[in-house]
């Protein structure tokens, strides 16, 4: 994903250490896309992949079982659902090595793609699908073959989930320990957004996929046939046939609207482990929260 796989695994364990949840297994998946060389996003997330926080590694060895082995074993035991917050390489490998196991996945929520919003690594492509479009294409085609729909949490909705300085200060007031941790791991990301998009704050993409998985009413959208461009100038673009031009089976639910207030209540209730009554100022803070505009777009030509 955004960081090389070993670094990403260590970062996951650093966060779990902070949460006192090192009992949660972290497994290493593919270290490169199916066909092209790997391109990281450390320019966005810092040299350590975690906002240049340079936190100490968690003690103990990494799990030696591969992500592919774990998925195959787990799906033989029971049906599962997945939240994919990176490129879809591991799921493509699963299809190629054990299609029956993949077919036992009940639900896939994927943070990736974009419908009407501009891309973040090309004019038309979002990073996760751009990084491995062949893998994304394999997964979307398999969903069509199965008669199922992947849930696409794309930039149209994630760009409306902006952690602003006011929200971060609010978190620090409510819980100085958690607030300090979040500030430390997002400072580089805040600076990146200002430098490249003149946005005061940072878009927090992945938590929206988790929120939508837990409560499908956080986002709204429509079903459509989606294909992923694998090469050329549009490489990685999620081509959404919103008007049934091709008359192909709908293999995706494309979310294009998000209840920002509902999301932030869910987000803060969980990371701060508090009830809604403590968040009495949140509505006020979100009143003018439309940092990117209603459709996740901004004019950044300045």
PLM region spans:
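Short, surface-exposed amphipathic charged segments that create phosphate/polyanion-binding patches used
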Residues: 39-47, 122-126, 167-170, 243
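Active-site histidine-anchored catalytic micro-motif
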Residues: 1-14, 54-160, 165
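Conformational coupling and interaction surfaces
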Residues: 130-134, 147-302
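Active-site rim/loop-helix segments in enzyme catalytic domains that contact anionic ligands
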Residues: 1-48
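Short glycine/proline- and acidic residue-enriched helix-loop micro-motifs
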Residues: 49-59, 193-196
């Amino acid at each position: 994903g955004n960081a090389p796989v070993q670094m990403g695994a260590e970062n996951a364990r650093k966060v779990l250490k902070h949460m006192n949840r090192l009992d949660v297994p972290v497994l290493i998946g593919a270290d490169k896309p199916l066909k092209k060389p790997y391109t990281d996003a450390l320019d966005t997330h810092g040299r350590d992949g975690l906002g240049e926080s340079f936190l100490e590694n968690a003690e103990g060895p990494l799990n030696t079982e591969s992500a592919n082995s774990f998925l195959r074993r787990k799906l033989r035991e029971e049906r599962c659902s997945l939240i994919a917050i990176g490129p879809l390489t591991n799921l493509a490998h699963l299809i190629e090595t054990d299609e029956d196991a993949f077919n036992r996945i009940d639900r896939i929520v994927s943070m990736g793609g974009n419908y009407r919003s501009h891309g973040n690594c090309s004019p038309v492509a979002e990073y996760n699908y751009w990084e491995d479009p062949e893998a994304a294409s394999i997964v979307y085609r398999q969903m069509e073959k199965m008669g199922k729909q992947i849930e696409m949490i794309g930039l149209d909705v994630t760009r409306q989930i902006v952690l602003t300085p006011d929200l971060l200060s609010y978190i620090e007031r409510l819980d100085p320990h958690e607030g300090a941790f979040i500030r430390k791991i997002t400072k580089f990301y805040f600076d990146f957004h200002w430098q490249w998009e003149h946005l005061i704050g940072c878009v927090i993409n992945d938590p929206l996929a988790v929120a939508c998985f837990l409560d499908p009413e956080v986002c709204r959208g429509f079903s459509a046939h989606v294909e992923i461009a694998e090469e050329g100038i549009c490489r990685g673009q999620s081509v959404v046939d919103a008007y049934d031009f091709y008359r192909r089976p709908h293999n995706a639910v494309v979310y294009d609207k998000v209840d920002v207030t509902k999301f932030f209540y869910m987000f803060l209730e969980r990371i701060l482990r508090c009830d809604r009554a403590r968040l009495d100022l949140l509505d006020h803070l979100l009143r003018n929260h439309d940092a990117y505009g209603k459709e996740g777009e901004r004019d950044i030509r300045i």
